[in-house]
């Protein structure tokens, strides 16, 4: 059985079952999708056949059509997702532009907001990884991580921990950065704060001060 509360909620449903739609136009286009929960005006509005999605907040998962196993909480979170699956987004406009990217986690307002097709990214913090579009396998924890300075966009395999931590370029790969307001180069592990950092190349290279190991 289904539960529909609100004008035009579950309006197009045919054989879909075990759906809950609360709010005007929530799950409005759903036909055969099952086990979906939409709470908030326009939440999961375009969903047709997809299953096991949860959208809480105005227009959350608004454009989702066939993407499955997504969880979205916050106004316009995962708004443009269409076929991407197994994504988790909490916070206003988190993962807003995601369309087909899958297995991503964005927690915090505007976290991973520009991601479109990039998979397996984790961003926790206000505007964390906000400029990443197609990058993959990035992990970011902290306020504006990966978003200050140049802003990571298409790089992959980066780990950024600490407020304002980032990379030296938009396409940086395999940078490990720990500290506050410090940027790391690809292929290096960087620790510290601001300009006072130490850095070592991955592998057997010993730690060096920033003065002789700064990426140029």
Can you say where each PLM-predicted feature lies in the sequence?
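Glycine- and small/polar-enriched repetitive beta-structure motifs of secreted/surface proteins
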Residues: 1-212
């Amino acid at each position: 059985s289904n539960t529909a509360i609100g004008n035009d909620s579950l309006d197009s449903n045919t054989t879909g079952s075990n759906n809950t739609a609360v709010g005007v136009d929530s799950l409005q286009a759903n036909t055969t999708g099952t086990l979906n929960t939409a709470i908030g005006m326009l939440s999961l509005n375009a969903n047709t056949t997809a299953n096991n999605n949860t959208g809480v907040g105005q227009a959350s998962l608004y454009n989702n059509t066939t993407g499955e196993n997504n969880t979205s909480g916050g106004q316009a979170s995962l708004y443009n997702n269409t076929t991407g699956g197994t994504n988790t987004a909490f916070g206003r406009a988190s993962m807003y532009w995601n369309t087909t990217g899958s297995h991503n986690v964005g927690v915090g307002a505007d976290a991973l907001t520009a991601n479109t097709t990039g998979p397996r990214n984790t961003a926790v913090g206000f505007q964390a990884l906000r400029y990443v579009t197609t990058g993959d396998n990035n992990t970011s924890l902290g306020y504006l991580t990966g978003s200050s300075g140049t802003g990571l966009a298409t790089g992959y395999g980066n780990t950024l921990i600490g407020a304002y931590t980032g990379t030296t370029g938009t396409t940086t790969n395999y940078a490990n950065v720990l500290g506050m307001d410090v940027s790391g180069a690809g292929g290096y592990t960087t620790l510290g704060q601001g300009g006072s950092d130490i850095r070592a190349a991955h592998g057997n290279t010993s730690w060096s001060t920033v003065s002789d190991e700064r990426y140029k």
